[in-house]
């Protein structure tokens, strides 16, 4: 159960795709409207910052569903990933639902493994782990 919550934020895979399999836009940003039943209910924004062989990816998702002008559902997610030479090396993420559920994780490359900590404690994960970041 502990690992399940962490794994919902990260996808473990043995076959990593090249980080640049998704072309990074020239302006460094991708913005989407989140649409439900033909109505915009939120936004999903991704910002890419490159400096030599380091890529920082910041993701912000904000969703709010209203029924008769009253908020019926809210979801927010923020994450920052660091990639060095195409390798996933660090993450900080926070997801907040409209109820009491709130998830956070911090993780970092550690030689032969990926060390992560969050609401369920600390975990040592496979080095080939990838975040579920919706862009790569």
Pin down the residues of each PLM region.
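Solvent-exposed helix/loop surface patches that form functional interfaces
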Residues: 25-27, 92-136
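Tryptophan-centered motif/residue detector
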Residues: 44, 83, 134-136
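Intrinsically disordered regions, especially transient/low-confidence alpha-helical propensity segments
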Residues: 11-13, 80, 132
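N-terminal cleavable signal peptides for secretion/export
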Residues: 2, 17-74, 78-80, 91-101
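Bacterial N-terminal signal peptides
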Residues: 8-18
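Bacterial N-terminal signal peptides that target proteins for export
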Residues: 1-8
């Amino acid at each position: 159960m502990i690992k399940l919550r962490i794994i919902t934020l990260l996808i473990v895979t043995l076959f990593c795709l090249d980080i640049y399999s998704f072309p990074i836009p020239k302006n460094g940003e991708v913005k989407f409207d989140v649409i439900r039943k033909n109505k915009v209910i939120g936004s999903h924004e991704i910002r890419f910052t490159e400096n030599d062989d380091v890529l920082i990816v910041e993701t912000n998702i904000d969703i709010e569903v209203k029924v008769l002008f009253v908020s019926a559902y809210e979801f927010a997610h923020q994450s920052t990933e660091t990639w060095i030479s195409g390798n996933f090396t660090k993450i900080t993420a926070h997801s907040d639902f409209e109820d009491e559920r709130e998830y956070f994780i911090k993780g970092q490359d550690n030689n032969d493994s990926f060390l992560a900590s969050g609401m369920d404690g600390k975990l040592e994960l496979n080095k080939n782990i990838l975040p579920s970041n919706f862009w790569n």
